Amino acid sequence: MLEDNERVDHLIKEGYEIIQNDEVFSFSTDALLLGYLTEVRKNDKVMDLCSGNGVIPLLLAAKSTQPIEGIEIQEQLVSMARRSFKLNDLNDRLTMHRMDLKDVYQTFQPAQYTLVTC
């Protein structure tokens, strides 16, 4: 499950694990604050832009049973996020799309989502 230079870190409060790699994006305090301070309502349709390794979808998944989608352009980070979702048995609720933000409107419509993080 882990590739070169990767490690598994723990999101202790949520009881989840996340794959990280110091050679690419690793989450920090700002991502934790965004995840902790974001309120997910019962019927929200959630999208996280520039998702990196999927930390925000993981943090929000601990607050809600709603499906959450993420968008990230870097293939390595998309792979790490998808493997983290699988590691936590969240593949049924969390989806990561590899996509440039310039192309989002070709696939998704803004009205589809009631909560967008970035």
Segments and roles (model prediction):
Residues 2-41:
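Class I SAM-dependent transferase core
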Residues 37-118:
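Conserved SAM/SAH cofactor-binding pocket of Class I
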